[in-house]
Regions:
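Intrinsic-disorder/low-complexity, polar/charged segments enriched in Ser/Thr/Lys/Arg/Asp/Glu/Gln
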Residues: 3-9, 53, 62, 75, ...
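Hydrophobic/aromatic beta-strand elements that line small-molecule binding cavities or substrate pockets
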Residues: 8-10, 63-69, 90-97, 109
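Short strand-connecting beta-turns/loops that link adjacent beta-strands
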Residues: 15, 61, 72-73, 98-102
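Hydrophobic ligand-binding cavity/cleft-lining segments
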Residues: 1-44, 160-171
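Beta-strand/loop substructures that line and gate deep hydrophobic ligand-binding cavities in soluble
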Residues: 82-132, 139, 148-149
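Short coil/turn motifs at beta-sheet boundaries
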Residues: 1-3, 47-49, 58, 86-88, ...
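Glycine-rich portal/gate segments that line the openings of hydrophobic small-molecule binding cavities
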Residues: 31, 40-84, 135-171
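Residue-level detection of beta-strand scaffold positions
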Residues: 11, 22, 77-80, 107-109
């Protein structure tokens, strides 16, 4: 079957460690994705790290994803191991710092459909689902980050992060 790809890049006005913490917390991913997530098996040594399995209920589909590579604040690589209307599904999420208060997520998915001729539809649905989820993630992370006061080491005064517009780009 044909391999299809979905690639999205988003920029957020928060450090990459904030985005990583939110996207690596399997049990709470439902806040951003229109699906229910449950951590079925913990990874090692980190609970959400390599070997972690999460169950996803999305509409009529129930499937499991397993983390196969993980480096804190850098990347997460997972694959679907059971269920879903796709074969050979792999997801790569890379986190990059732009500066101290801005970062980028590069999200790349490859898959092949189980039913021939449905790849274009699945690609559209995955891209829409993922774009909506990343926009929700960025809005949440920026709201939380900007409402959290920080202390400067010299003046000992409190200030909020400056707001910079968020950009979303789909390839």
């Amino acid at each position: 079957m044909t391999i299809h790809t979905v690639t999205l890049e988003v920029t957020a006005n928060v450090p990459k460690k904030v985005l990583f913490a939110l996207l690596s917390d399997h049990a709470k991913l439902g806040r951003f994705f229109n699906a229910q997530y449950t951590l079925v098996r913990s990874g090692k040594p980190e609970e959400n790290g390599i070997g972690a399995i999460r169950e996803v209920i999305h509409g009529p589909f129930t499937y499991q994803e397993q983390v196969i590579d993980y480096k804190e604040n850098e990347h997460i690589h997972y694959q679907i191991i059971h269920g879903a209307p796709v074969n050979e599904h792999g997801g790569w999420i890379k986190f990059t710092s732009i500066n101290a208060t801005q970062s980028q997520i590069h999200y790349h998915i490859t898959f092949s459909p189980k039913i021939k001729g449905t790849g274009w539809l699945l690609k559209y649905q995955i891209q829409h689902f993922l774009k909506q989820a990343l926009n929700n993630l960025i809005q949440h992370s920026e709201d939380v980050w900007q409402s959290t006061p920080t202390v400067t080491p010299y003046s000992h005064t409190t200030h909020e992060q400056d707001a910079i517009s968020t950009k979303t780009r789909a390839k």
